[in-house]
């Protein structure tokens, strides 16, 4: 504020100087105007007033020169003063900055010392380090589980690929088998067709034979009718022909029987082939069903193994969480017990210190009283000895004793005042120590909150108990952190 006021004063002085210069310039301008008017008049009266004009012009020039010199001197002085003022302000600003920097370094050094010597901050740092270790351990466990899961996933994919490859091979084999069956069926169809054509040809040959027989019968009849005379010869010939026909019929019957047996054998083979194909199809279906059952069993085994591994991992995590909670609860109980013992011990020490201080105070007061009494007696005796009270009359003796008593009381009062001053100084030193301790406690609290703000968000879910001293610590870290922390706390309580 003072610097601002000084800056305003400097600005006002500068403005005042500018105004003065402006007035001087106006004055100079007025003089110049007058000079111009005079010059005009002198032009009119040049012949009459030439000498006076030269003198007046010289006077004006001298005055103008003096004004210019004065203005230049004032400007130089003002600039010098402004430079000195600016230099002083810069020096003062540099001193203030150095002081602020020194105070900042001093405060930082004190905070560093407090951080190094504070048991609470060291405990908090240990807890945060433990939380980071827990987080790292959880990350390693999660990474191992992820690797196991990826391995199981790869195994499942490999098994799935093998099953698909097996299915594809079975499908290709079935397709090849179907193709072979179709080829065989087509072959048997072609064979049956050929047999039918052969049978048809045989039937045509038989019909042709019958036609020839009819023709022969017709010829025989004609011969019988035309030549009865040669009946005997032709009859023999006819008998021979009949025998030939009978033999031909017998051979044809044998051929038909043979063909029928061949057809029956062929049909039997076809039936056997069909039965064999049916048996193969049944075997193939049984093999496919068996492979499908094996695949389902393998898939179920993999699923059960995966579920078992997941269940074991969950059980392991639950056991680890329970062990961690039990360990943290044990640490918290032990810490509470230690804090209670420490508090009780501190109370006992404070009580003992108070009793010792009271006893010491009593001793000091008693000693002070005894010392005052001894001092009073000594001083009275000394004064009595010095003034030889026995040589004085009673009135002077009483006056002298009263004077001695007053002097002794004055000395006692001075000693009492000195004692009170010493106690007041001790009280002030104790209050100063308390204020210093309060400042240190404030620094510890600030550093504790700073550590929490810096690390608590990254360690959410891994912070041990006892990190937060009060509910306000959680609220300082933000609404989102508080909600997630409460949810995790509820989950841990439910477990």
Curated annotation (Swiss-Prot):
Q: Which regions span the lipid bilayer?
A: none
One CC-aspect GO term: sperm flagellum
Q: What biological-process terms (Gene Ontology) are attached? A: cilium organization; flagellated sperm motility; meiotic cell cycle
Indicate where the modification Phosphotyrosine is found in the sequence: 188
Localization in the cell: Nucleus; Cytoplasm, Cytoskeleton, Cilium axoneme; Cytoplasm, Cytoskeleton, Flagellum axoneme
Q: Where is this region: Interaction with BBOF1?
A: 1-314
Q: What is its main location?
A: nucleus
InterPro entries in the cross-refs: MNS1, TPH_dom
Q: Which residues form a coiled coil?
A: 59-410
Matching entries from PANTHER family are given as: MEIOSIS-SPECIFIC NUCLEAR STRUCTURAL PROTEIN 1
> Function of this protein?
Microtubule inner protein (MIP) part of the dynein-decorated doublet microtubules (DMTs) in cilia axoneme, which is required for motile cilia beating. May play a role in the control of meiotic division and germ cell differentiation through regulation of pairing and recombination during meiosis. Required for sperm flagella assembly. May play a role in the assembly and function of the outer dynein arm-docking complex (ODA-DC). ODA-DC mediates outer dynein arms (ODA) binding onto the axonemal doublet microtubules.
> What's the protein name?
Meiosis-specific nuclear structural protein 1
What species does this protein belong to?
Answer: Macaca fascicularis
């Amino acid at each position: 504020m003072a610097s601002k006021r000084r800056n305003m004063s400097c600005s006002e002085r500068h403005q005042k100087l500018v105004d003065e210069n402006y007035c001087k310039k106006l004055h100079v301008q007025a003089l110049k105007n007058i000079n111009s008017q005079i010059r005009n008049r002198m032009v009119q009266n040049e012949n009459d007033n030439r000498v006076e004009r030269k003198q007046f012009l010289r006077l004006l020039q001298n005055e103008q020169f003096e004004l210019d010199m004065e203005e230049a001197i004032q400007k130089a002085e003002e600039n010098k003063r402004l430079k000195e003022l600016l230099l002083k302000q810069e020096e003062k600003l540099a001193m203030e900055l150095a002081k602020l920097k020194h105070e900042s370094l001093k405060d930082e050094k004190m905070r560093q010392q407090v951080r190094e010597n504070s048991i609470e901050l060291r405990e908090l740092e240990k807890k945060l380090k433990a939380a980071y270790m827990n987080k790292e351990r959880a990350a390693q466990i999660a990474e191992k589980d992820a690797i196991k899961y990826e391995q199981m996933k790869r195994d499942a994919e490999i098994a799935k690929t093998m099953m698909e490859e097996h299915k594809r091979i079975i499908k290709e084999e079935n397709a090849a088998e179907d193709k072979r069956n179709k080829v065989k069926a087509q072959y048997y169809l072609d064979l049956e067709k050929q047999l039918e054509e052969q049978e048809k040809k045989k039937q045509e040959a038989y019909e042709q034979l019958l036609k020839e027989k009819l023709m022969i019968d017709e010829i025989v009849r004609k011969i019988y009718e035309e030549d009865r005379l040669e009946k005997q010869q032709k009859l023999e010939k006819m008998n021979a022909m009949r025998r030939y026909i009978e033999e031909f019929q017998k051979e044809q019957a044998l051929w038909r029987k043979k063909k029928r047996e061949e057809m029956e054998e062929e049909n039997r083979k076809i039936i056997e082939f069909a039965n064999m194909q049916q048996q193969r199809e049944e075997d193939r279906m049984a093999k496919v069903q068996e492979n499908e059952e094996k695949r389902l069993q393998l898939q179920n085994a993999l699923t059960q193994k995966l579920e078992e591994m997941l269940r074991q991992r969950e059980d392991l995590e639950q056991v680890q969480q329970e062990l961690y909670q039990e360990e943290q609860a044990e640490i918290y109980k032990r810490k509470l017990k230690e804090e209670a013992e420490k508090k009780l011990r501190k109370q006992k020490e404070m009580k003992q210190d108070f009793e010792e201080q009271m006893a010491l105070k009593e001793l000091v007061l008693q000693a002070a009283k005894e010392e005052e009494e001894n001092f009073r007696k000594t001083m009275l005796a000394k004064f009595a000895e010095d003034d030889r009270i026995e040589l004085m009359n009673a009135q002077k003796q009483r006056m002298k004793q009263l004077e001695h008593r007053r002097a002794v009381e004055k000395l006692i009062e001075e000693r009492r005042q000195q004692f009170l001053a010493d106690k007041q100084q001790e009280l002030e030193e104790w209050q100063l120590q308390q204020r210093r301790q309060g400042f240190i406690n404030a620094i510890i609290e600030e550093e504790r909150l700073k550590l929490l703000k810096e690390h608590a968000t990254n360690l959410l879910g891994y912070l041990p108990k006892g990190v937060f001293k009060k509910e306000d610590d959680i609220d300082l870290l933000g609404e989102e952190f508080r909600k997630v922390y409460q949810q995790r706390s509820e989950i841990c309580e439910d477990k």
